[in-house]
């Protein structure tokens, strides 16, 4: 199982981070060990002093593929959920200054959180999926799939030009504006529409 992630896929988030708007999708990966297993507590990692949440829509790959065309891409994923790409922002900033890869900041154990899956058969319009994140009952991120720079089909097709996609792979499709710091004791809740898909306490 592979975990693909898309960076800078919302204009407002790219701007809040001081990044240029990319000409093509920015792809990075997390290992399988990054996935926080169900019913497993999340602990604040000891190696960072600035842990940030990044709420994202996450796709589940349902069919093996390679070199997928945009117009066929929807056949390769079957469900969506909300998730968190946890980021050690202090480490990431240092790595970016040196032009180094981000794995230490983003790919560590349990840094990828996913909620309950919603089959696309229950989604009225994949280009109009509202989602958000609450921290301690206060909304901190809210966006919609219609604000993505690259939509689901473009992302799947683009990734498949470089990597095979396989059943069970996950794609974190990018975070909108509003990323921020979390500390021990914070409660994070991810939503699609009005449905709570995960609740997590930082321990």
What name fits each language-model region?
Residues 1-166, 170, 178-203:
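Catalytic-core "active-site belt" of small-molecule-metabolizing enzymes
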